[in-house]
Amino acid sequence: MKKTIVLLLLLPLLSCYNTEHNCKDFKTGKFKFEYKVEGVKKTTVFERNDSIEIETFEGKTDTSRIRWVNNCEYVLQKIHPKNMVEKKAIMMKILTTTKNSYIFEFGIVGSDAKQRGTVEKVSE
């Protein structure tokens, strides 16, 4: 009985927490993704429209096709892959959004291995 009462008291508090999902705000624009590799900060800048993403990393530019699965998930496929690894499609999933950023999860299509990151929108 006590467990039921505690659960009923906590339920309204849990329902107040809503994860923001304004994925449509991030379908197009210019973005920045910062991360660390062996303690060294790396930055990737990319621009995305509804069907193409152009990414620049360490002075090199790559272009990928985008296939939107739904408003928060899309698949990236490099247009000019340079090796077998780059031929593999990458599934991207926006998990939460804020006004100018989003947290996402990504991995090679068909693989259970996933990574997470945060992207900042720098312009429309």
What are these regions (language model features)?
Residues M1-T4:
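Positively charged n-region of N-terminal signal peptides that target proteins for export
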Residues L13-S15:
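C-terminal motif of bacterial Sec signal peptides marking the signal peptidase cleavage site
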Residues Y17-T19:
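Bacterial signal peptide processing site
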Residues C23-G39:
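Tryptophan-anchored aromatic micro-motifs
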Residues K42-V69:
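N-terminal glycine/threonine-rich, aromatic-flanked beta-hairpin/loop signature
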Residues E55, I103-R116:
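Short, exposed beta-strand-loop hairpins at the edges of beta-sheets
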Residues R65-E73, I94-S101, K121-E124:
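A short, structured loop/turn motif at beta-sheet edges
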Residues L76-K99:
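An anionic, turn-rich surface loop/hairpin at beta-sheet edges
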